[in-house]
Amino acid sequence: ASSFLFWYKNLYLSLPKIFGMPTLLITFGMRFFFYLDEHQPIHVHVDCNSKKAKIALEPSVSLVYNHGLKEQELKKASETCAIYRDDFIAEWHKRFD
């Protein structure tokens, strides 16, 4: 699958809000995003072809729930969260603090 990265080295490109939800990253067919009314603990939502997951970023990257993602998709989503964890957390603080 083609990968659409909106990240460049040390540069975050803020995408327009899609369906009222700030998108952080689109890659491997997965969209990583926040809802507008988020709450602690810090986490991201993942959408992959209408399948959904929620991944906590603190205290460490961990799965909160999964609704339909396959094991391989969950692994890729968790790995992506680990790679971009600091960027996602910084964006959380910019939006919700």
Report residues per predicted region.
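Short, charged low-complexity linear motifs
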Residues: 21, 28-30, 69, 73-78
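Cationic, amphipathic, low-complexity segments that mediate targeting or membrane/lipid association
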Residues: 1-3
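Conserved recognition-core residues within compact binding domains
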Residues: 14-16, 23, 50
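A short, structured beta-strand/loop element
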Residues: 35-69
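Short, charged/polar N-terminal "headpieces" of proteins
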Residues: 18-40
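C-terminal structural segments of small proteins and small subunits
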Residues: 71-97
